[in-house]
Amino acid sequence: MSWLRSSPLRQSFSKAGGGSGSGASSRGGNSTNGTVRAFDASECDPKACYDSFCIHWQQAFEIIQRSENNRGQSHDDVLGVVTHLDHMVTLLLVELHHCNKVGLPGAPAPPAPCLEHLLSENLLDKLYEWGVKTGRYANAVRLEQLKLYEQLVSHSRHQLLVHEPFLRPLLKILASSQNEIYPPDVEKRLVILLNQLCVVLMQNVHLLDLFFFSTAQQNGSGGHANFIIFSLLIPYVHQEGSLGHQARDALLLCMACPRRLDRGTYIATYSSICPVWFTRAGEGLYSRLPNQIDIKTIDWYRITTDDVTELQELTLFMNSLEFCNAVVQVAHSMIRQQLLDFLYQGFLVPVLGPAVLQTNVESQISAMAYLDLIVRSVTEPGLIQIVVKFLLDEEKFDGQRILDVLVERLNSNDTRLCMVSLSLFDTLLSLNCEDIMLELALKYLLNCQHVPISHRFKVNRVDPYSNAVEYFLNTSPDIMKKVNNVLNINNNNNNTSQASSMLGSGPSSMPQGGRNVSKTIGANWNHYGNNTGETLMANYQAYLLEARNRIVQCKHACDQWNNVYRYQKLSKLVNNSSSLSHSGNGTAGSEDVRTYKVQMIKNFLAEFTTAPDSAVDMAGDGDRSSLCQSPAGMFGTGHHASHLMATTSKQLDSLQSLGDSSGYESLNITNLGTGSEDGRRHEAWKVSSVKEETIVDLDLSEDLFAQGTVSLGPFLTAIWGKLQTFTSNCLYVNLHLTGLISHLAWFPLPLLHSILLRPDIPTTSDTPSFHQVLKILKQQIDAELPDCDESLEIVDVARSFLVDREFRLINMRKNAIESNPHSGKLLLPNGATGASGPVSMTSNLSQTTPMQLTPSSSYDPFKRNDTKRKSISNSFSSIFRRPGSSASSGLAQVFQFFTGGGSSSNSSSISHQSSSTPSPAGSQQYLSSNSSGVSSFMGSSRRESREAETQFVDHPSIGGPPSSMGPTSLTSTGSPHNSLEYSLVNINGSIVGGIGSERQRDLAVSAVVLDEWLKELAAITQEQCIIMISDQVSSQKPGKLS
């Protein structure tokens, strides 16, 4: 029947002649070569068109009558009717084009004699009755009828649906199409017609009743029938390509109609869209996803848009999820609620929950990656709400919460699982959800038991001098301070002799302070302009700008929360007394409040009777000023009130750490003799109450875990635990870890600031405080990476490696296309047989490429954050981030970048690397245009650059022959302790053999990352302080800041 399938569809009043069958040549003399003859409606005589229309119908009707008398349909009969019908459609389009011309206001509509004849003579009904009897030609005739209806619905300005001669045969052909399997061309025409009908219904909502009542009549049983448009469209919702897209668009349009009428109940009750969707999406599409993902790149950590495009099963699942998100956005409230209920009860709990709770590590990685993809894709608050409910639900999973399981996996020794977990929590934080933040951290900090009593008054106060900024900058390792000084000297030298500096003129042209540092510090960093010595990305101002943007965005979201999470200085009793004073006897109530305040102060002073008077007075005055503040802005309503009562049973435990203003003094105190221990402790407490303490050396032999009994919660405890192993973690673990902590610091929550950004506030938790861990890392790096020429050169190579990685990301599209156009393919492993193969499929994410690497790809499930994801806001850290399975950390990976695994390939690798490095001018122009997104290490708005992080350098794997497949990803070759014998190559191509040990190289990378991260924390601290002061100035009178 190809001769009928090639029948022309006249669009925009053009006629396509010809076909693929033998009968095409008989079409009224039309060309058989597929030529197009354009129609000009202005040149056609309306009377002649009408006469021709009547003649074609008369001839077609004669053929219909003759075939009915012969009791059989011949090939020539069907072809003749179709040919005449084809000409009739053309004449109708010409007439409709003439009628649709814009006329004068108030002028009568031009006549449409052809259309009137079509309706008055019931031609459509006669065609339908004849088409039913055409036997094996029924599909071909139906195809022509669907084309006719489509043209009339889409081009006619008349409301044809209100005319019974048009509506009755239309409903007949739609009703007869239910539960039928048609050829692809008929399905396509049917979906197009349904789409056009939905457009008309959207424009004329009152016509929706015609289809509801008519479908009930078609059922004939007196009961309710499914809405016929839904019944026909639902089977195509999960189809691939344009057919599925048109079906989903049509359903969305039709669902938007009941939102304006009281038809949502009918659709929700009598249509099967929700059960069908979740049967296919939950049990069908998700179960087809690979159960295990074969990760080949060392820095992979999440599914990207290209992964979705490359893997057909994932594309179908995401299309279905996008459709669900759109339905929730536009549908009637009852439909929306039913859809959310089905999603929770039919997909999240029975399908996704068990998948996340699997015990196999590979399955856990894939399930968490899918969960991360789902959270990043949904945008509607209703969907986000049920996802949060899924994470916090205890009843559905035998008293075990999904969120608690995810927190436990942060401590995993598997690098890939740890990276995926960190990435997932970064995605959860990007939701800025109050419930998530409350469960992760805030509920453990609300009562402020982690802060000694004498310091709690500082929690809600602003540090106007921002001493924490200086603290973070001073915590940088000594080796990095030396390198930064050398860079500053070189930059000053560049201002006077830029040309010689660009060429790396050698030690003779460098100042004395920079002669012993390798040449790369003077050459490579000039790509960044005059401020290259301050930071890898640009300068400290860029960190400030990025920090302010992130904080403002986060603050805007947190302003919508139901509660204000601040430390409450008054107990529940005081709040109750205050409420009584307003409702009853005001004098008596106020007296009770004052009595209680005095008693609290007496209890406080009684604990420190041995302390000097001045210190006690200062602490007492501080608490008195805090206690006298109005409780109007305090948090504490509903079920959260139990977390806010001040407890005094463990105040003696807090006394132990009162001396650590910054968390370090008390550690040295405990090592002194018992005779002077108490005196030193009280002296330290006195000093910490009066002024900021300077950072002193930390005794690493001290047991840091014996300092207190207050827990910060499993989430923060897991984060601190990972931070303590910073120098031994994989490079990409550290990048995600630092980004996650920076993301926490963006929140405008003083309780979080007290443990992250306020070194002047000590903590009494059962783990080392955040600032203690930073000091430990500094001393560890200083001890193992001394300030010498060899260490400076190792750090120099590490910085060069990281900055060249940044350049490769800037030019990732060019490098990817030129190096390996076939990279990033998702392949099934050997032995897999596709959809009919084993249940546990494995998808090979051999190289996850950025979205821009697929020019033809139009799929983007992360549209909502598109404007954020376009920036290179990833600061220094987001440049080199993706987890590997288990690989050596730090500079153990530099060898693959520079040498490709052997000295024989050094020259080719370096030449390719050099070709991929942008010119200094181009680099500076790019960075200056993106200065607003330079500094942050992690965050939801940096997804695109992190997704794009992959290696594009053409080199073979370690110890293997040269690769013929273009660029290869960084691949794990075994355990994290593999012995890699290699030499480092600096940026100029010279081989630096045997520089330090592998441990020193790892420490060098850790030092660079730590140095940049501390700058970011300093910028965040400074901007948080400015924003808090601005808020107080706007809400209080000048001079009343406290």
Swiss-Prot record:
What segments bear the compositional bias annotation Polar residues? 1-14, 839-859
- Going by the entry's taxonomy, the superkingdom of the source organism is recorded as Eukaryota
According to the UniProt entry, which residue ranges have a biased composition of type Low complexity?
905-940, 956-976
Chain intervals for the UniProt region annotation (Disordered): 1-31, 494-514, 821-866, 905-977
What Pfam families does the entry give?
DUF5917 (PF19314), KELAA (PF19311), RAI16-like (PF10257)
Task: Indicate the family of this protein.
Answer: Belongs to the FHIP family.
Give the protein name, as stated in the record: FHIP family protein AAEL005291
